[in-house]
Amino acid sequence: MKTIVALGLLALATAASGQFLQDCTNALDGLYAIGNCESQFLTCSGGIARIMDCPADLIYNEPLLICDWRHNVVGCEGSGEASGEQSGEGSGEASGEGSGEASGEGSGEASGEGSGSGEGSGEENNVCEGLEDGAYSSGGCTTYYFFCTDNTARFLSCPTPLFYDVATQKCAWKALVEECNGEIIIDGSGETSGEGSGEASGENSGENSGEGSGEFEPTCDGKADGIYPNGVCVPNFLTCSGGIARVMNCPASLIFNPDILVCDWPRDVAECHGLSTPAPVCEDDGYFSFGQCSSSFTACTNGRAIVMFCPAGLKFSQANQRCDYDDLVNECQEASGEESSGEASGEQSGEGSGEASGEASGEASGENECVSLDNGLHAIGCSPRVLSCQNGHVDIFECPSSLVFNEQTLICDYPQTSLKCLIEDTLLIDETPITPFDCSTNGLFSDGLCSATYHQCSAGQLINFTCAETNAVFSAANAECVDSSTLLQCH
């Protein structure tokens, strides 16, 4: 026990000092950053180190242990975008992702360009000076907020696509945040014609029809930082950060909903009503890959098709009917380049697979869990995890990030639609308890939404812990015990 605690403190001290792990020597099983604003991260499992890639346009957010949008990671808001902007339209986005991000880390952060206005410059005043302990907005319509504890500030950001609501002191949909009223702009006259075929050339441009051939380029002129529609009933949206426009793609089968500013099911998007959408073909039950070396696949059960995603860094094997590492997937071996094909298929999952731990495919450790269940998909509590039972064979798959599996509709949907989710209007899925048999994913997990007890899963073994300090509870997002006053769910 003392050894595990000591290793945990060593890992936290290493991260706090700015020294990043390059291997798993003396490191606990888990996820680790390998640098600032990096699109890759390190996974440690049984002492074995693996470098995993985030989906396209995302970087690793170490406090939340997920791949996240750059503007959601404190200190990375302006990095990597300036050089991409200078390289020109069309190929500019693609080159910005390669050399742009690298140069952003080398020079962008150091010079403080973009919105990095003096972070870490030593000139900032203490924002908690004279404030009582509690949560505060960073100002206006923003995803950023901070906690003041004993005159010390801790800066956080809401998970995409939520914004901080001062009135309720929690993250909420943008449409419900008073400070954001009047900032939701839907321009039906210009944004619908030939949007962004040139802009999207570096990111999944296959989803765009290409009409306009780049003559119209989305712009953030006159718009505050945030998310905006990019057309009517389209599978992409516009993000504005520091005046720079980017077209982002929704996960497979989802359409951007301008009313709540999230990627949503077409049935819930008012603009799509009356428009024909192709129904997925699902003649036989089973699991079917989206293509060569892909992290996305379709689960067919009782004639219904459900789009699923492998955990981060894994690909779906049609032959083995499971998610696995690239070198164990035949489709990836046949591809010409494992690295490039991995990133290409990773784009399909969008923000959907960022929070997964990257451990191998998640076959359940309890083979008897499907004995009393029918063949099909079953929810594992209020979580993105899905239990698959097929003739006694057990697998665990995942819904996209921020979604949970709804057993009534048999789709991945928002938490408030699931009977197993008791907390409404929250995406703090990492804090929900997991079922006792499911210890296939290595890491630290809370025993409840506001609990002083937590447990560690390592190689299928479960170890229980209790926070030592009075009023301390375990935060799954921070992977450590924190004061209960700093967690919104404890208020």
UniProtKB/Swiss-Prot annotation:
Residues 200-210, 356-367 have a biased composition (Low complexity). Residues 21-78, 125-182, 217-274, 279-334, 367-423, 436-491 form the Chitin-binding type-2 domain. SUPFAM superfamilies: Invertebrate chitin-binding proteins (SSF57625). It comes from Caenorhabditis briggsae. Glycans are attached at S197, S201, N464. SMART domains: ChtBD2. One of its GO terms (cellular component) is extracellular region. Keywords: Cell cycle, Cell division, Chitin-binding, Developmental protein, Disulfide bond, Glycoprotein, Proteoglycan, Repeat, Signal. It comes from the Eukaryota. The keyword Heme does not apply. Disulfide bonds join C54-C67, C158-C171, C250-C263, C310-C323, C399-C412, C467-C481. GO terms for molecular function: chitin binding. Required for polar body extrusion during cytokinesis in embryo development. Affects cortical granule size. Shown to have roles in meiotic chromosome segregation, osmotic barrier function and polarization in conjunction with cpg-2. Binds chitin. Residues 87-120 have a biased composition (Gly residues). One of its GO terms (biological process) is embryo development ending in birth or egg hatching. Pfam families: CBM_14. PANTHER family: CHITIN BINDING PERITROPHIN-A, CHONDROITIN PROTEOGLYCAN-2. Residues 80-126, 187-217, 336-367 are annotated as: Disordered. Residues 1-18 form the signal peptide. This is Chondroitin proteoglycan 2.
